[in-house]
Amino acid sequence: MIFRWLLLVSCLLVALIPQQSSAKKSDQPKVTATKLEHEPFSLFYFEDSETVLMSLKNGEFKQSFDGGEEWEDVASSEDGRVTQPVVFIRQHPFDKNKAYALGVDGHHLVTTDQAKTWRSFDIGDQPALQHPPLVFHGWDSSKVIYQSEECAGFFCITVRLLRESAAGCSWAVGHPHFAEDMDLNQELKDRSLCVVPGLKVPFGHANRLVYSDDYFVSNIEGTEVNLHEGRPVSGVISTAAVKKFIVAAVKSKGTEELALFVTTDTNTWHRAEFDGHRIEQDAYTMLESTNYSLQVDVLTSPSSNMGVLFTSNSNGTFFSRNIEHTNRDMEGTVDFEKIAGIQGIVMVNTVKNPKEVKSGQAKKVISRISFDDGRSFQPLKVGDKNLHLHSVTTFANIGRVFSSPAPGLVMGIGNTGDHLQKYSDGDLYISDDAGVTWRHALDGPHKYEFGDQGAVVMAISDKGKSNKISFSLDHGKEWGSVEIEHKIYPTMVTTTPDSTSLRFLLVGKQNEESGFIVYSIDFKGLHERKCEEDDFEKWPARLDENGEPDCLMGHKQFFRRRKANADCFVDEEFKDPQPIMEPCKCTAEDFECEFKGSEDGKSCIPALLPVPPEGCKNPDDTFMGPSGWRLIPGDTCIRDGGKNLDHDVEWRCKDAGNVPTSGEISVEKQYFDARQFSAYYYLERQSSSSGNDETIVMLTSERALYVSHDHGKTWKQPLKGEAINRIVPHPYNSDGAFLLTDGAEGFWTVDRGQSFKPFDAPAPPTEERLPTLTFHPQYQDWLIWTGAVDCGSGDCHSNAYISKNRGDNWELLQRYVQKCEFESREGRKDSTNLIFCEQFENENRNNRLQLVSSKNWFSDSTVHFRDVINYATMSEFIVVASRDTEKPDSLVASSSVDGETFAEAKFPPNVNVPVQTAYTVLESSTHAVFLHVTVSNSEGAEYGSIIKSNSNGTSYVLSLGAVNRNFRGYVDFEKMQGIEGVAVANVVSNVNKLSDGEPKKLRTMITHNDGGQWTLLSPPNKDAEGKDFGCSVEGEGVPGCSLHLHGYTERRDERDTFSSSSAIGLMLGVGNVGDHLGGEDEADTFITRDAGFTWKSVKKGRYIWEFGDAGSLIVIVPESKPTKTLYYSLDEGDTWLDFVFSDVEMQIDDISTVPSDTSKSFLLWGKELKSDYQDKLATVSVDFSGLRSSSCKLDENSAESHDYYLWEPKHPFQSDNCLFGHVEQYHRKKPSAQCWNDWREPHVHSIGENCPCTRADFECDYNYEPQSDGSCALVQGLAPPDAMAVCREDPEAYQYWEPSGYRRLPQSTCQGGREMDHIVSKPCPNREEEYKKKHGISGAGLFFAIVIPIAVASAVGYYGYTRWDGKFGQIRLGENVGTSQGLLSRDSLLITIPVTIIAGAVAVIKALPLLATSLWRSASGYVRLGRNRGYSRPYASRGSFAARRGDYTGVVDDEDELLGVEDLEADEEEEL
């Protein structure tokens, strides 16, 4: 007992003796190394943990739970399966517990508990490469979109398809801050956005943005997003979620300019304005932004990689300029970084010598810092010296460049002096006051990182191999070091995302042989104690010019920060530093312009000033309205005692945005010192273009250039004194044009005539009638110049030169050429550098002309044809006319789709032209070439046949015979713009009498199914004066009584077409009603509103016309006849009003408007008669915009609205509205609507369900010709096409279809119905077994085919037996007749046996067709099998229709292309 007490007392005494500290201070950090055979590819920490994930370049996937000391392979917790190789790992950005690992084999992993467990899931499609493979929901971390190369899907626990054929999908809530202050949780929680192909065109300029609130379940197409003024926009490239914003980038065809649309709720979108700057594709970078503004850097100098930094207002609509000449690299990376955790501090690098850089000198980069959110910038200072630091474009680590969550600690590699030097010559600099002052830290470049909220700073030399780690415990004032075991080339240094840990990870490469090493470096033992309250300071994050704490967003910001000299660690892992906010009184900096600011920045311009109820009677009257200022959302300033800029102010009525319009048409007349114009072109803004100009460039007969930006109201002479010979508009960029002179000098504009820059060509323009300039479709600065060489000697010839910088430099491409063209096309594989040239053999003009091509600027080339006459490019086809080797006086046509393989065209036998002298390529926008083959080229008797190709342009069928052409080879054929498949042509009705000298008699015909069937035009019943025509018919026209129109061959300007792509369904023409087309003096003017079904007489006599405002406005004026009056219609030609545009009579030769026909202004070209200006060219600008004051309201999601209705094109031979196998719907303004369309890009509203196949979806096959009843019959004496050719051409084909006489129209999407091209299939030779497998009936199928009819027969017989009551036709009410045992009772053998036999026999007879059908379907694989490989497939959905490759646009803008011997004649006036 005593011993126990003594033991207890001894223990107590020992306990009272002072003990040595358990946490003994160490001089060195703890270092642990892990060797790897392969390089780490991706590495990250889970937030608030020591767990690290790492993937290696060979696909290995590892994890560590102790900050990198020990590593293990990641495996599924379900089956222990290791997912390798892993191609992508990603931490969920909004859920710190989740991460995803995507495997290359479709097997993937997800963790929801920071890698403690992993769950596998399978998606077979490969992860996307061009888009982020995983897209995360900002509110609900269980929702993820998986984007693959094939499609896009979303998954949580299960995986299901989201949207096929999407160019990219995202959640509407792409960030936790999105719509966080709005009551939109239910509306947005499941909303997804997808960029999808256009309904008719799969190329980028037609892409649409759609959304769905149920993962596209109820509507596979989704609902189109109204991006611009409540209407959808085409050309959507991508979307991006940036804090509380979503940004959509849009680019229209024909311009490089982008439009950015911004929303904060996905419902209301606005176009962002950039203070006069234009944004181009791949020329802007979305930077790290705040919760209250977007920051964007816009490329201004592509060749020298410089930009301008912009910051938006709080709704992202108006951007103000922050700083010019920001430094960028080729990938669009910008030297820009916000200091982490501190509001308003931004570091950027700019170019000091921008002018010298543009002339080819090296950049001199300097560093700048802003402490007021980019309003002003100042240099970085080390004492009195300027400091320049390497930034994002030369960053050599991961994570942020300069800062971390450690408050106020900033580091960088650079130098003092005039400008930034090479990275290898830089030193390490540090600041502990958020960049206000800097000091030198270590010599040489280093990789660096912050830990323990800045209490530890670690660095390692980045100049060669090193084994020395430097560290500082006092904000970089003094440095210690520790050596590691191996010398390494460091590749990355990192730590926990919040920089609160004392443990760092260092990855380095030892040498080529020994692989990589991962070091875990733990500084926990370097201080003995944890910091106490006295070791902290209240540190102000921003200081003003007086050194006092500064206000931003209505408050001052402070941090509780460890003092630099405190000998302790904060040691609060995973506890982020929290800012302390103190409010300030409101100042002007707390307000922003609601719309945009004035030029001086001192006031705001409101988006719209509402006029008070009493209205504005006089422009100088005043009223009280909003100032245009507003408090920045999120600003916390105190209004009491501060500034208040958002109160109402006084405005004058003339400043109001909705003052009633004048109700009048305005006119401006201008005169020119020339008798006439030589040429004019519109440089039209596209939908994504900024500005509101309507630009025209015009060349007079005196070779003077004039430019107007207001549709001819005023004109300027920007190149006065320069003799311009020709205007060449850029065919792929409507902002650009080139102006050529007689010499080697020229000018160009790429900003719609705002400026013109000179360029020097390598030679004067070619003296032959050849294209001098040709352009690349995608790279719009790539040019080919064809110039005249050695013309002073006897060997004048043309050479081709190429420039890739808009004429700054030229290189010789080919010598002795006729023409050279880029043949790059969307959908044509590997064609970026593809060029075709017509070149004389052996560079001798006396030799044959060859067609050659090259993909490497003719370092080597391919000869396709050795005796070519000409070639033409139309849509996806290259068509070549070459001499027939067997008939030198005849031609052979060949075509290619890929630009590599050419196939000779197979002409139909009913086009019998023994000597083929000329072809005219008419049009090929519907996956088929329309080719006019000249049959007769006798003067005054020219005509030919229009033949139409299959989808690869090789096999032709007759579409229409005896089609009129003129001596120059142009053809009376025109496609209707805006609606596919409608075309008008003039045929010669008296072909047999032309040889007798009788003049041609023309009739006009129309097709509604792309040339498959043609009819005469239906004549109107009465003329414009209400009088009857000499004949009358109901429905389509008949010989002797139909409408005939003067066509393409009689036009002064090929741009004066019947129709417009924006005026859907409308056509105007000049002609007459009768047996054939009469003279122009007999012609009247006619209009159709239903795409040519019915016509109405508009005016007696010949008029010229233009459409405006997408068809809601039509203007006509007498052609070449003294007049001072024009006529206009606001209801699609139903009624007409007159307007006197001149006080003296004029002769009007032309009327013009923008090519899209969407303007409300028109320009009349002519001369005054009997005036002092009668010898001068005059233009009259007529502006109708004052007639109406409002825009029409369109609801895309509603079939009908107050201002619009849905219109469907029809086919004359069908009762439904199916055209090419589907129903199209277009929005058209109601003629009675008193508003303007104001829509620059009308488009298909929808493509309805695919229709069953009918005769209209097919045309006659090769060697077949149409009969009088519309059927197709084999031409007498000819054999059907070789159906087995598909078996020889395609080694994978196992079947072929016997010729039926029909082939499907390439653009038809019909399904089922009368599939007239596929009736009987047969196996390919040696593929019978596979054919049987696909078509043969299985044992189970045979069993059911036999048993089911017998069972049905038995059931029917039994039914007849059990229901027989001996009283046919009786209605039994309550009788108990079942007990009757008479001869006619149902139990009688006289009844039971015959009834059973008869009923069974009837059932079997009725079942036999079902059995036959069942057997046939079984033999056909039940579901109809696919067609021959390479054939156009039908479509199961509108989604699949939208995915179809090809171009379904309207008529090609280019004039007809001529291919023929006649091109060689000296009198040929046109050359293509």
UniProtKB/Swiss-Prot annotation:
The chain crosses the membrane at residues 1336-1356, 1389-1409. SUPFAM superfamilies: Oligoxyloglucan reducing end-specific cellobiohydrolase (SSF110296). The keyword Transport applies. Functions as a sorting receptor in the Golgi compartment required for the intracellular sorting and delivery of soluble vacuolar proteins, like carboxypeptidase Y (CPY) and proteinase A. Executes multiple rounds of sorting by cycling between the late Golgi and a prevacuolar endosome-like compartment. Residues 1-23 form the signal peptide. Residues 24-1335, 1410-1472 are lumenal. Belongs to the VPS10-related sortilin family. Disulfide bonds: none annotated. This is Vacuolar protein sorting/targeting protein 10. Keywords: Glycoprotein, Golgi apparatus, Membrane, Protein transport, Receptor, Repeat, Signal, Transmembrane, Transmembrane helix, Transport. One of its GO terms (cellular component) is cytosol. BNR repeats lie at residues 64-72, 369-378, 429-439, 706-716, 801-811, 1127-1136. It is found in: Golgi apparatus, trans-Golgi network membrane; Prevacuolar compartment membrane. Glycans are attached at residues 291, 315, 952. CDD domains: Sialidase_non-viral. It is a multi-pass membrane protein. The keyword Transport applies. Residues 1357-1388 are cytoplasmic. Pfam families: Sortilin-Vps10 (PF15902), Sortilin_C (PF15901). InterPro entries: Sortilin_C, Sortilin_N, VPS10, VPS10-sortilin, WD40/YVTN_repeat-like_dom_sf. It comes from Aspergillus niger (strain ATCC MYA-4892 / CBS 513.88 / FGSC A1513). GO terms for biological process: Golgi to endosome transport; Golgi to vacuole transport; protein targeting to vacuole.
